């Protein structure tokens, strides 16, 4: 068990075999789970963990995180070079991979749209050459069209580079095309898990069913 204020995680265990969606409604424990995996919780909380049996803590150069709230300082090129000490040519290549034109490389974040800024964040994550890419609600603040573009970009890049993926979201519709497996959280507990398509088509728990219905309401493309 891991406790953080009023929030508690209980007996959470899962494997990331390829691409996994970690979903649940607000307050379900998604972000707390992610922080626990990344060893980002306050040091006082480590005493509440049974050594590392609750989570195999993920550290080091194998992991990159795309946070919910992107950075606000340094222009794109400087940010990539500053954070991971990559060469100019590599930084330009990364920006090209995420679909940003060269003229945008020297702009500051305040001059970029939400979609452009998220592409920069993706480039920064890729500069780390991760084996596992973790995403924390990366499309929450984007409009529907930009959101679809970012999700398509992530799918294309993952198919090209072949990294593992953990996608944290409250929106199952966002992860449907990206992830093969799903873990559903409620009040810090796993209530359902399995192949994503199977869970969407045949949810066993009423909580999962309600989450799916709220996500796919009025979506004509889901039949």
Predicted segment positions?
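Conserved ABC ATPase signature
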Residues: 108-112, 116
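H-loop/switch region of ABC-family ATPase nucleotide-binding domains
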Residues: 169-170
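A short, surface-exposed alpha-helical micro-motif characterized by mixed small hydrophobic
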Residues: 175-177
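C-terminal boundary and immediately downstream tail of ABC-type ATPase nucleotide-binding domains
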Residues: 200-223
């Amino acid at each position: 068990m891991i406790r953080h204020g009023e929030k508690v995680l209980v007996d959470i265990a899962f494997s990331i075999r390829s691409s996994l969606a970690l979903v649940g409604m607000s307050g379900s424990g998604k972000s707390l789970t992610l922080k626990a995996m990344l060893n980002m919780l306050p040091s006082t909380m480590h005493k509440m963990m049974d050594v590392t049996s609750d989570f195999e803590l993920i550290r080091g150069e194998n992991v990159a995180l795309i946070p919910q709230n992107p950075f606000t300082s340094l222009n794109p090129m400087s940010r990539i070079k500053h954070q991971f000490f990559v060469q100019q040519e590599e930084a330009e290549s990364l920006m090209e991979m995420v679909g940003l034109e060269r003229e945008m490389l020297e702009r500051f974040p305040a001059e970029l749209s939400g979609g452009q800024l998220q592409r920069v964040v993706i480039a920064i994550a890729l500069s780390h050459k991760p084996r596992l890419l973790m995403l924390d609600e990366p499309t929450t603040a984007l409009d529907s069209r930009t959101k679809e573009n970012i999700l398509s970009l992530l799918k294309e890049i993952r198919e090209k580079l072949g990294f593992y993926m953990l996608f944290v979201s409250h929106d199952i519709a966002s992860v449907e095309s990206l992830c093969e497996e799903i873990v559903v959280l409620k009040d810090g507990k796993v209530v359902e898990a399995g192949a994503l398509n199977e869970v969407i088509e045949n949810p066993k728990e009423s909580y999962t069913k309600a989450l799916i219905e709220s996500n796919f309401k009025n979506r004509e493309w889901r039949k």
